[in-house]
Amino acid sequence: MQYREYGKTGMRLSTLGYGCMRLPSVDGEVDEDEAIRCLREAVERGVNYFDTAWFYHGGNSEIVLGRALKDGYRERIFLSTKNKEKTTDGKKWRSLLDEQLVKLDVDYLDVYHFHGINWEQWTEKLSVPGGPLDEMRNAQKEGIVKHCAFSFHGDAGDVMKLVDTGEFDGMLVQYNLLDRSNEEGIAYANSKGMGVIVMGPVGGGRLGGASKALQEMIPGDVKSTPEA
């Protein structure tokens, strides 16, 4: 496994992380035993960054990941989750953080994201006095959150504005061969010393799955787009 620095945090993260939005499932429910096996196998193979969120798998992703991190696995990885609240109410935002710590059954988070934010939400809600940003700082002072970050699905121009606030240690953005809209923002964040995590590196499977058109054009058993 290869590892890279996450901005100025001192964290060295595996270049391949484990996103827990889609864990092994049967009939729409998480197959807990198989999920725990897969998560722990990833740790054994060198993966040390695990990312989840409050509503993944109907709220069960954090619970299952927390169980997988028992027996000494928590100490071997960096844990990230996200707060979905887009509110001016800092206490409401903090309440969700406290709930997530219980679900994960951990004492602290290595990275905590403002989930899927845009510039308007940041300026009008999340960063107002007494709001979520103030509670994020309180959580950091308490040692509950190590590093503050944001995840992003919006207009690419907002990325650089958010970076320029100077409030974040890192960010999580979409980037792959099919979607390079955040390329400039990623380079800018790097130039400012921020950590960057990429989501969807294979386009939700579109870049890894076999293409029907290519299968018809190319003889043999094509298993993936890169192979073709």
Give each language-model segment a name.
Residues 44, 140, 191-194, 201, ...:
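Conserved short secondary-structure transition element at the edge of the structured enzyme core
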Residues 62-81, 132-143, 198:
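Alpha-helix-loop-beta-strand connector modules within alpha/beta enzyme cores
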